[in-house]
Amino acid sequence: MTTAYRFDNLWSLRAPHERVYAALADVEDYDHWWLQVREVHRIDGERARVRIRSLLPYTLDLVLTRAVQDEARGILRVDVAGDLQGWSAWQLSAEGADTRARFSQEVQVTVPMLKRAPSAIRPLLRGNHAHMMRSGERGLRKYLT
């Protein structure tokens, strides 16, 4: 089974670009509005340890390292290490008074148990991610109001 995953999600948010960018840049606050983000602990000025659990009975343990933080271009990108290896990024664009936030992620699973899982569970892992992203969008919308 391949252990590589690529995700692309688009959120439409009724909030100005600056507020959305500030909320997404503040990883330490994710667990206040994103239910699946269970814990966030800052390691230093560039890194945070994040524990994530969606529907499946497994908690991902990740270290996110800031790679790009460019508000003028609306880009946030982190390198991902731990149970997943790769990167995640937000690309924001203003649409009038609203903001579009595109989340992109390319990761490899590093957890031996998940690496050995049959390809039949790939749809479950994708569904788990989709649920987490829908919940995050709802949480951020509420947080921004």
What function would you assign to each model-found segment?
Residues M1-G45:
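Hydrophobic ligand-binding cavity/cleft-lining segments
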Residues N9, V37, L62-V68, W87-A94, ...:
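Hydrophobic/aromatic beta-strand elements that line small-molecule binding cavities or substrate pockets
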Residues A15-H17, D70, E95-A97:
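Short loop segments at secondary-structure junctions
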Residues D31-H32, H41-W87, R100, S135-T145:
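Glycine-rich portal/gate segments that line the openings of hydrophobic small-molecule binding cavities
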Residues V80-S135:
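Beta-strand/loop substructures that line and gate deep hydrophobic ligand-binding cavities in soluble
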